[in-house]
A protein has these predicted regions:
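Class I S-adenosyl-L-methionine-dependent methyltransferase catalytic core
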Residues: 1-185
Length: 185
């Protein structure tokens, strides 16, 4: 896997060795092609390899925070960060904590939040509730959720029933992956 575009284009991104489903290049490309990422802050929840955050930084995001609970994945993120950004760690933060625990505790705010837990995970709704109730997403911010096709319809129905302050901005389907991009209004 490689960074697709920007100042670090072509740089290799390694992935954790076990049971991880990295975001496909075509999903990453679609996500970044619909957004203006320059000078934005990004929160990459369930970061895995850090690919979303590193792609954002390569495209001139102001800062990225990567949240991951898996110890091996966090080690992988640190390796990738060192390889891609040398010792310039002012551009990013890496935290080993669950996404929901981070969202419960943080006082940080972000312009863009990318949520990509394992497809079988149940944290989508809890994470969304924390993000909205705690005002973690800035006004006019973007929330993206990557989920499995078999969870897509239920997720959309529950979101539409529960939340009026976000609107669907874009939906892309790639095989068994669905990328839903919301705008916070």
């Amino acid at each position: 896997m490689h960074i697709i575009s920007g100042s670090k284009k072509g740089r290799k991104i390694i992935t954790p060795k076990r049971n991880f489903r990295p975001t496909q290049s075509k999903v990453r490309e679609a996500f970044f092609n619909v957004l203006d990422i320059e000078n934005k802050t990004i929160l990459d929840l369930c970061s895995g390899s850090g690919a979303i955050a590193f792609e954002a930084l390569s495209r001139n995001a102001k800062h990225a925070t990567m949240i991951e609970i898996d110890r091996e994945a966090v080690k992988t993120i640190f390796i990738n960060a060192k390889e891609i950004f040398a010792d310039d760690n002012s551009l990013y933060k890496i935290k080993r904590i669950s996404a929901c625990d981070y969202l419960k505790k943080t006082n940080d705010k972000f312009d863009i939040i990318y949520l990509d837990p394992p497809y079988h995970s149940k944290i989508y709704y809890d994470a969304l509730n924390y993000i909205l109730k705690r005002n973690i997403l800035n006004k006019d911010g973007i929330l993206a959720a990557e989920l499995g096709l078999n969870h897509y319809r239920g997720f959309i129905k529950n979101i539409n029933d529960a939340v009026s302050c976000i609107m669907k901005y874009d939906i892309r389907i790639y095989g068994d992956s669905v990328l839903i991009i919301f705008k916070y209004v």
